[in-house]
C-alpha cells in the first residue's frame, strides 16, 4: 500500500514505515501529524485518485527530527571588473516517519 500526498508545495510518494524529508513543519519532535491533502492511495489493484484530494484520505506520521540541509553556495561574478559576491544557504527540513495510511 502506498499513497501520494502534498506538503510544502511538493508531492511525496510514501508507504507505511518509510521516513520522508519534508519542508520544515512547526511541530515538536515526537509528536504526530496528519496530512489530509492526499492525492492518491493505492492498495494492491485498488487505486483511489482524488479530484484534487481523496475524500477521507489521511496519512498519519510521527516527527523524527528537525535539521538543516547541505550548504548551497550562490556566486555572483563579473569578469575583469574585480567584482565577486558569495552567499550561502541552508534550508530547514523535518524528517517524519509514516505510521498509517487510511482512505
Curated annotation (Swiss-Prot):
Keywords: Ribonucleoprotein, Ribosomal protein, RNA-binding, rRNA-binding. Transmembrane segments: none annotated. GO terms for molecular function: rRNA binding; structural constituent of ribosome. InterPro entries: bL21-like (IPR028909), bL21-like_sf (IPR036164), Ribosomal_bL21 (IPR001787), Ribosomal_bL21_CS (IPR018258). GO terms for cellular component: cytoplasm; cytosol; cytosolic large ribosomal subunit. Part of the 50S ribosomal subunit. Contacts protein L20. This is Large ribosomal subunit protein bL21. It comes from Escherichia coli (strain K12).
Amino acid at each position: 500500500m502506498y499513497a501520494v500526498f502534498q506538503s510544502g508545495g511538493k508531492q511525496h510518494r510514501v508507504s507505511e514505515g518509510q521516513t520522508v524529508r519534508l519542508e520544515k513543519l512547526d511541530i515538536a519532535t515526537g509528536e504526530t501529524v496528519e496530512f489530509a491533502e492526499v492525492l492518491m492511495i493505492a492498495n494492491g489493484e485498488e487505486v483511489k485518485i482524488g479530484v484534487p484530494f481523496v475524500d477521507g484520505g489521511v496519512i498519519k506520521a510521527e516527527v523524527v527530527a528537525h535539521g538543516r540541509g547541505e550548504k548551497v553556495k550562490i556566486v555572483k561574478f563579473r569578469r575583469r571588473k574585480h567584482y565577486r559576491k558569495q552567499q550561502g544557504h541552508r534550508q530547514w527540513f523535518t524528517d517524519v516517519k509514516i505510521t498509517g495510511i487510511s482512505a
